[in-house]
Amino acid sequence: MKKIWLALAGMVLAFSASAAQISDGKQYITLDKPVAGEPQVLEFFSFYCPHCYQFEEVLHVSDNVKKKLPKGTKMTKYHVEFLGPLGKELTQAWAVAMALGVEDKVTVPLFEAVQKTQTVQSAADIRKVFVDAGVKGEDYDAAWNSFVVKSLVAQQEKAAADLQLQGVPAMFVNGKYQINPQGMDTSSMDVFVQQYADTVKYLVDKK
């Protein structure tokens, strides 16, 4: 029993130490103008952004953040239109992915088609990535100009403007805090990712 208690106490102390090391201005920044009504955890990215590709494909930041979040916490991902020649089209395509619930199916193929093979040069090329990933062409076409997709595009644009987004990748919590990767421990990739995820969880709990 004593051993179990010591183990639990060690876990509590470890958590306390971890939480104590997270501070405003270092791992996160409190926004001057909080934005009400934003998703609990909101990530902005672009398929044109090399660092976003690293976050998704190499570091798996989003996956690690999701694992740490309390049950029921909503995590949302928005695409930005200010990067690349097809930024607007990719933002609309991401809205299609959200509407059809196929984000996980198309994320990696789109990143690779835009950055690795550079086979995405037109709106038709984007559509082909979806179809190759198993999305029916008719479903994609029906969603493309739908009211739902137009609304999701508007949501993405409004959130980026309201939060005064300066660049990507970026993550916000409760419309009040922005994660600051520059303040993270970069001694190793694992340490960086865990501190990033711990910071998001800390801010979700903080409310």
Swiss-Prot record:
Disulfide feature: C49-C52
Residue ranges that the Swiss-Prot or TrEMBL entry lists as coiled coil: none
UniProt keyword Transit peptide present: no
One Pfam entry name: DSBA
N-terminal signal peptide: 1-19
Localisation per UniProt entry: Periplasm
GO molecular function: disulfide oxidoreductase activity
Broad class of where this protein is predominantly found: periplasm
Domain Thioredoxin as annotated: residue spans: 20-158
Organism superkingdom: Bacteria
Keywords: Disulfide bond, Periplasm, Redox-active center, Signal
InterPro entries for this protein: DSBA-like_thioredoxin_dom, DsbA/DsbL, Thiol_disulfide_DsbA, Thioredoxin-like_sf, Thioredoxin_CS, Thioredoxin_domain
CC annotations in GO: periplasmic space
Record family assignment: Belongs to the thioredoxin family. DsbA subfamily.
Function: Required for disulfide bond formation in some periplasmic proteins such as PhoA or OmpA. Acts by transferring its disulfide bond to other proteins and is reduced in the process. DsbA is reoxidized by DsbB. It is required for pilus biogenesis.
Protein name according to UniProt: Thiol:disulfide interchange protein DsbA
Gene: dsbA
